[in-house]
């Protein structure tokens, strides 16, 4: 276990993560509903992150392959998703991330995205991890709700044996009986013990899986409190899905965070992050 951040290292676009470096942000709408939504969210997030000096990665999904109901909206599909990601990347000059579900999706995305994301339910899929790693790009693996924090070391080994150590692990809550998740903060120092950069997913950690019958429910009101707790452990990145009108979003309507409120929440996290890394963790490591 390591009660500190991970070792400092180079990241995207000349930025660094780890040590006392400030957090970066992965954020965007849960799913690609339409081009106008992607434009609006990315433009506003770039403005917010530029003002707050937060390194920003745009995120959105072309296919939500694990929806609870077969009738739920999944997204535009891979071909249209690639066009959308190319459009956002070229227009805003921003790194982009999307999730993949099959190894066949890796190659078509290679020249477009900067970070591959492995969904939580697929976090043990060796071929998906290894072949993503072989591209040489960063790979963000969502830690499954069922996975012990110590078992993330196996993910790191799969990455390293593929010749790539550009791994991020995202903590997104742990199953707590049926239809509920909790955030177990012990996961952060445990994962840091393997020197893996840790991202905290504040929006999915507030989910109530299957609680809405045909879809996943959630408790958006707890997101700020959960995020404060995670930041106080010292983390490298924050993951948050945002939407201008969450109740009418086509996916994760109960947990996407209101776009209009993201700036004030991030400002609060900047102060807490700076205090923890400069005054607590780094000073403690020198004792």
Swiss-Prot record:
Subcellular location as annotated: Cytoplasm
Entry keywords, A to Z: Cytoplasm, Lipopolysaccharide biosynthesis, Transferase
GO biological process: keto-3-deoxy-D-manno-octulosonic acid biosynthetic process; monosaccharide biosynthetic process
Enzyme class: transferase
Entry GO terms, CC: cytosol
Swiss-Prot/TrEMBL catalytic activity: D-arabinose 5-phosphate + phosphoenolpyruvate + H2O = 3-deoxy-alpha-D-manno-2-octulosonate-8-phosphate + phosphate
InterPro entries: Aldolase_TIM, DAHP1/KDSA, KDO8P_synthase
Name under which the protein is recorded: 2-dehydro-3-deoxyphosphooctonate aldolase
Species of origin: Leptospira interrogans serogroup Icterohaemorrhagiae serovar Lai (strain 56601)
Designated gene of the protein: kdsA
